[in-house]
Amino acid sequence: MKTGYLIDMDGVIYRENQLIPGARDFVEALIGSGAPFVFLTNNSAPTPEDLSVRLGHLGIPGLSSRHFYTSALNTADFLGETHPGCTVFVIGEGGLLTALHERRIPNDGLHPSYVVVGEGAVSMEKLAKAHSCIEGGARLLATNPDNWCPVSSEGTRPGAGATAAFLEASTGRRAYYLGKPNGYMFHRARRKLVEMTGGSSLEEIVMIGDTMETDIRGAIEAGLHAYLVLSGSTQAESLIDYVYQPTRVLGSVADLIEELRSGKPSSRLDSPVFSLPGVKRRRVGNRHQTDIQVHNKPRPRAPMTR
C-alpha cells in the first residue's frame, strides 16, 4: 500500500529550538521507506529553504525545499489559479513576499485586488493603508486563521488571523482564510505528494498534526487519515470537546518509527475511546478565526461618533 504523509512542524517535529524526541529517527524512517512526505505549516513567514536550513540546524539535514509547503505558497497558488492577473497589498514579509513574487503577483499600494495578511511586523500605518484599500474595493485574504502562534513554552505572538480580524472589525468586510484547515491547502499538498511519486496515485494519505482545529479538522474534511500527536498543543482530555475525532492518537511521531521501518501498519487503527470526567479549563481565547461562529454576511460596523 503506497502511503503519503503530510506533517505539521511546530509541536510535531520540534518545540521552540529543540527536536521532539524521536523526530530525527522518524524522518530517517520516512526517507528509508520511500514514502512521499511534505511538511505542512500555517506559518507564512519562512520560505521552504528557510525551513530546510532550520531543520538542518536542529539535526535533520539534507531535506530539499520540495518537502515543505507553507500557507504563503498556498496563498500564492490560490491567487495564481483563481485570479490570474490580480494585484495585492501585503501585510507580511519573508516567505509571503517571496511566494507572491515567484508567482508573478505584483504589489499594488493604490488599487489592489486583494489585501493579503500574513505573519510579520504590523504598524498602524500599514493597517490604515490596508483599511483604505479594502474600503476602495480590495478583498481581504489571510494566509491562515491563527489568532496567535507560540514563540516559547510560555509566550505567544499575534498571528495572521488576529491581524485579519482587526481589519474585519474596522471595515465590516469578511476575510477569506487559507492555510489549514481550508480544503485548498490540503488539495495542493495532496497534489505535491502525487508529483513526488511521478504521477502515481496514492492509496492512502495521512496528516500528522498536534492541533485539532487545523490539522485534524482539515484532514478529516479533506477525506484523509488524521493522526493526532500529543507532543504539542493538544492534551488527551480535551478530545471530549470535539465532535470530530482523529483516526489515531499517538504520543509523538516516535510511535510510528517501527511501522515505517517494518512496512507493517499496526492493527490498532482507531483512536482510543476517551471516557474522561468533565474537566474545568481556563479558556484563553480562540486560537483560530475558524473557531468563531460567524454568519455569511458582512459584519456590521458601529456608527462613527464625533
Give the ranges of each region predicted by the language model.
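Asp-based, Mg2+/Mn2+-dependent phosphohydrolase catalytic module
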Residues: 2-9, 14-32, 44-69, 76-301, ...
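N-terminal phosphate-binding loop and flanking beta/alpha elements of the actin-like ATPase fold
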Residues: 36
